[in-house]
Curated annotation (Swiss-Prot):
Further facts: The iminoaspartate product is unstable in aqueous solution and can decompose to oxaloacetate and ammonia.
The reaction(s) this protein catalyses: L-aspartate + NADP(+) + H2O = oxaloacetate + NH4(+) + NADPH + H(+); L-aspartate + NAD(+) + H2O = oxaloacetate + NH4(+) + NADH + H(+)
Keyword field contains Protein transport: no
Role description: Specifically catalyzes the NAD or NADP-dependent dehydrogenation of L-aspartate to iminoaspartate.
Gene Ontology biological process terms from the UniProt entry: NAD biosynthetic process
Metabolic or biological pathway: Cofactor biosynthesis; NAD(+) biosynthesis; iminoaspartate from L-aspartate (dehydrogenase route): step 1/1
The protein's name in its UniProt record: L-aspartate dehydrogenase
Coiled coil residues, start to end: none
Length: 271
């Protein structure tokens, strides 16, 4: 049992836009101590320079000075295999933001098996979308249908298969660029898959969740909509998310979700 007066010893995996925002938010929390940061080798010197000697900055789990009580992943899909799996096996509870990677069943099984072997808990963060608590609760009574509709400005789809479907730089009207399962959406649009995968894993699964992705010149933000029906009734939730002030490609709510996970871990009353 944790000493009620001792701060929770935390390892952060990744120190990009989300990681830096999370660190700044909890840096002075008395109940939390971000004592470790894991980043790729080529980033270690820069992160050490930013954080100073008070944080153990390393490039692997094996290099950690001691085992943390809790780990937060906000580094991208590769970090799940490289860092989260060994931490779970060692008994460290982990929260992860890179949910889109879990469309790979082998990876999801590896994480689940590692958590089981280490007696640890793996928490999937809700990230950029709300309503996940309601959807997961509704699943207990049975869900008949779950749909996710994601809209982005056309230029938000650059570098994706949408470029072969329409001219993203000269759109005058909205166009659907994908319709299918959440699993297929995650495989075709991996950089845009976290929300669809989160909705799917909370609800009816990656194959039964229907996804529609839209390039829409009328929107200036990323817009997420969940529609579900089942024994609980019906729900429809839509969110228009702002980005982090210093990174227009990163959802502010994703960072806030990670901050909440850390503070919940240190709290004795959680909602």
């Amino acid at each position: 049992m944790r000493n009620a007066h001792a701060p929770v010893d935390v390892a952060m995996i990744g120190f990009g836009a989300i990681g830096a925002a999370v660190y700044r938010a909890v840096e002075h929390d008395a109940a939390l101590r971000v004592a470790h940061v894991i980043v790729p080798e080529h980033q270690c010197d820069a992160v050490r320079g930013a954080l100073g000697e008070r944080v153990d900055v390393v490039s692997s789990v094996d290099a950690l000075a001691c085992r943390p009580q809790f780990a937060l992943e906000c580094a991208g899909h590769g970090a799940l295999v490289d860092h989260v799996v060994p931490l779970l096996k060692a008994g460290t509870d982990c929260a992860v933001a890179s949910i889109g990677a879990l469309s790979d069943l082998a990876l999801l099984d590896a994480l689940s098996n590692a958590a089981d072997a280490g007696g640890a808990t793996l928490t999937l963060l809700s990230g950029a979308i709300g309503g996940i608590d309601a959807l997961a609760a509704a699943r207990q009574g049975g869900l008949d249908e779950v749909r996710y509709i994601g809209r982005k400005p056309p230029l938000g789809w650059l570098g994706t298969p949408a470029e072969a479907i329409c001219d993203l730089r000269a759109m005058a009207a909205e166009q659907t660029i994908f319709e299918g399962s959440a699993r297929d959406a995650a495989q075709l649009y991996p950089r845009n898959a976290n929300v669809a995968a989160t909705v799917a894993l909370a609800g009816v699964g990656l194959d039964a969740t229907r996804v529609c992705l839209i390039a829409d010149p009328a929107v200036t933000r990323n817009v997420h909509r969940i529609v579900a029906r089942g024994a609980f009734g019906e729900m429809s939730i839509e969110m228009s998310g702002k980005p982090l002030p210093d990174n227009p490609k990163t959802s502010a709510l994703t960072a806030f979700s990670a901050i909440r996970a850390l503070r919940n871990r240190a709290s004795h009353c959680v909602i």
